[in-house]
Amino acid sequence: MLGVATLVFALIHLIPGDPAQAMLGETASEQDVQALRERLGLDRPLFEQYGAFLAGIARGDLGTSLRTNEPVATAILDRLPATLELAAAAMVVSIGVAIPLGIIAAVRRGTFLDHLATTLALTGISIPNFWLGPLLAIVFAVELGWLPVAGRGTAAHLVLPAISLGAALAAILARMTRASLLEELREPYVQAARARGTSRARAVLRHAFRNSLIPVVTLVGLQFGGVLTGAVITETIFAWPGVGRLLIQSIGFRDYPLVQGCILFIAMTYVAMNLLTDLAYGVLDPRIRYE
């Protein structure tokens, strides 16, 4: 995390523009801008600002927003439920679509259903969410009027952002599920189960499918960080009041502490998900033991 913190600090301070100038506006005098820079501590050398930044992280203090004077941790925690709600909905959409699609494609390999599932997966991977989001909004919100286009309040507000965010992950998971399940179906133990009279559905779902889940779970854990990153774009498109939108707004205002805090939060969440993924291996495969 030290490397992430250092990289974030360096990149943030390379962004062109002056936070004090952005806060006061273009019409502010040089004296007012300089006074605000001194009050915010932006006139100090970068190494002093960097040291204060690391010391704050060590204390659990991410600093204070330059624009609102609100603690960064408080600002992130206020937006966190919305981001977690969107991320969870996107994961439910992606897993709920991908797993059945991957199973059907593997079991019906070479048939029309397999080709259809493969085509859908390739389409989902090819369409970026910054293009899919506006397309969904135009079709289902503006033209058809079936769903709200922006905001957060009801379950209907969640549908379009969740589909936009989860589509690419669903496509990737479907391909992984298909490939992993096909590999397991070739294993001798599956053939032995079928020879003992086990039905095909039972052999697939009870034996092959469970063993094929390990790479799928790995991918889900790794892609969760991608979901949080994609949420930055999706939340901005649909005006979803989460951490991703907060990050974009703070970049626009050159709010260094808030930008740093949001990026660190995403990085720490990614690390935590990788840890949980490793722990899930032992549940899926009893042969795996941790020392």
Annotated model-derived regions:
Residues 2-6, 46, 88-92, 131, ...:
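Hydrophobic alpha-helical transmembrane segments of multi-pass integral membrane proteins
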Residues 38-47, 59-72, 150, 173, ...:
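Membrane-interfacial helix-loop-helix junctions in multi-pass membrane proteins
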Residues 74-113, 142, 152-291:
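Alpha-helical transmembrane segments of integral membrane proteins
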Residues 3-51, 65, 141-160:
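Hydrophobic alpha-helical transmembrane segments of membrane transport/permease proteins
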Residues 7-14, 44, 55, 119-148, ...:
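Membrane-water interface segments at the C-terminal ends of transmembrane alpha-helices
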Residues 43-99:
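An internal, D/E-rich "acidic patch" concept
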Residues 9, 13-14, 66, 90-122, ...:
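Transmembrane-helix boundary motif in ABC transporter permease subunits
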